[in-house]
């Protein structure tokens, strides 16, 4: 699930994905992509 959070590497997406109610995420094309629960 893509969210509108810019990133350079996947570690930057852990907190935004948690805040969005999802488990974890990776950085894809400069934006965070989260895994739903």
Curated annotation (Swiss-Prot):
It comes from Mesobuthus eupeus. It is found in: Secreted. Blocks voltage-gated potassium channels Kv1.1/KCNA1 (IC(50)=203.15 pM), Kv1.2/KCNA2 (IC(50)=8.92 nM) from rat and human Kv1.3 KCNA3/KCNA3 (IC(50)=171 pM) potently. At 2 uM, also blocks Shaker IR and has a moderate effect on rat Kv1.6/KCNA6. The modification Lysine amide is found at residue 37. Disulfide bonds join 7-27, 13-32, 17-34. Negative results: has no effect on rat Kv1.4/KCNA4, Kv1.5/KCNA5, Kv4.1/KCND1 or human Kv11.1/KCNH2 and Kv3.1/KCNC1. InterPro entries: Scorpion_toxin-like_sf, Scorpion_toxinS_K_inh. Expressed by the venom gland. It comes from the Eukaryota. One of its GO terms (cellular component) is extracellular region. This is Potassium channel toxin alpha-KTx 3.13. One of its GO terms (molecular function) is potassium channel inhibitor activity.
């Amino acid at each position: 699930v893509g969210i509108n959070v810019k990133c350079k590497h996947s570690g930057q997406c852990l907190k935004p994905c948690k805040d969005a109610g999802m488990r974890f995420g990776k950085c894809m094309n400069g934006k965070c992509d989260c895994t739903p629960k």
